[in-house]
Design a protein with these regions (language model features):
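Beta-strand/loop-rich accessory regions of lumenal/periplasmic or secreted enzymes
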Residues: 10, 24-340
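Extracellular and select intracellular beta-sandwich modules with Ser/Thr-enriched
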Residues: 15-22
Length: 340
């Protein structure tokens, strides 16, 4: 980081006030020591797949179609099954260009994605091999559990959500989507978690300190920042999308004792990240802040892409195409989470 600051006081700012800065990322090549394989055990039940390792255990449900439990250090870390998410709350700018009407199928896809043919052999929408859902593959260093979801769109679409569980408690997560002709671009591509509201502090290595978006990040600095989850809710007259963070290498959401979840992404392909007291749907449903529901969860969204917020005008201009996820080709997003 290069920073230019005032050498002396002026009528408009004190000595030391920053007037300009520039940043560049320098890649450091390091040899990565080979990691030892931490032992784990896999249990296949009638309706569940369990994995137990060093200080953790996880449970995947055949009946409910997802990761239903992640215990770390004796504490349950998730409150609901993580879900593929393709929707962000509309902004005032979006209302002018009818984003909800044009892209509304992705809201339904987020709310009502259903695991395909739970516990049965099923064909893919795209043809090809018969799939068991979920699939479970035990490898030398990890267990790979993959779910295939039907998305409530027309024409029909599907996505897969893969969990690779390592013996030390890390879960590498990959969301994959193959394009379907005739569908509008999605506002967001990521995974939504609900954890207990006691996890109320977020720290991240990425752009900050203020919120940033795909088309609102050039004035931000790459660094390590921290704030309260509640402070990421902008005080708009009408609740709408807010609090996003771009270029995130890692982020952790913790309670007052420092316990929580750590999310990491490849530095070469950092993620978008959000930690708020509400889901996009709860924010969208409230026309005034007092209509927001009581806070029960911290809602985490780890995202490969999120549509920008636009703003050329607020009465019809769309977000620029380069800031909208491209769904004309396969889309994949990989990140890792673990308890801390």
């Amino acid at each position: 980081t290069i920073s230019f600051r005032l050498k002396e006081d002026t009528s408009w700012a004190k000595k030391g006030h920053e007037v300009a800065f520039g940043q560049g990322v320098i890649a450091v090549v390091r040899s990565i020591p080979s990691k030892k394989v931490t032992p784990f055990t896999v249990t296949h039940g009638t309706h569940n797949i369990g994995v137990r390792g060093e200080n953790f255990d996880v449970l995947f449900s055949d009946l409910n179609g997802g990761l239903t439990s992640y215990h770390y250090a004796g504490k349950e870390m998730i409150q609901e099954i993580p879900r593929p998410n393709f929707w962000r709350a509309p902004t005032d700018n979006d209302c002018g260009n009818n984003m909800g009407g044009v892209r509304g199928q992705w809201k339904l896809a987020s709310l009502y994605a259903t695991a395909k043919g739970i516990g049965k052999e099923i064909p893919s929408v795209h043809g090809g091999t018969i799939l068991q859902n979920p699939t479970c593959e035990v490898e030398a260093d990890s267990v790979v559990v993959t779910y295939l979801y039907n998305l409530q769109t027309s024409p029909a679409a599907e996505c897969s959500l893969q969990y690779r569980v390592f013996g030390d408690g890390r879960i590498q997560t990959t969301l994959h989507y193959d394009p379907v002709e005739g569908l509008a671009a999605m506002p967001e591509f990521g995974v939504l978690f609900k954890i207990d509201a006691d996890y109320d502090t977020v720290e991240w290595y990425g752009n900050g300190p203020a919120e940033t978006y795909w088309d609102r990040q050039h004035g931000a600095k790459l660094g390590i920042y921290q704030n309260k989850v509640a402070d990421n809710m902008a005080q708009y007259l009408v609740p709408q999308e807010c609090g996003a963070k771009t270029a995130v290498r890692w982020a952790k959401v913790v309670d007052r004792k420092g316990r929580g979840l750590l999310f990491t992404a490849d530095a070469a392909k950092p993620m978008f990240f959000s930690a708020l007291p509400y889901t996009p749907h709860e924010m969208e449903s409230a026309k005034h802040p007092y209509e927001l529901p009581p806070v029960h969860y911290t809602v985490i969204r780890a995202m490969g892409e999120q549509m920008g917020v636009g703003g050329d005008d607020s009465w019809g201009a769309n977000v620029h195409p380069e800031y909208i996820p491209d769904v004309t080709k396969p889309v994949e997003f990989t990140f890792t989470f673990r308890g801390i």
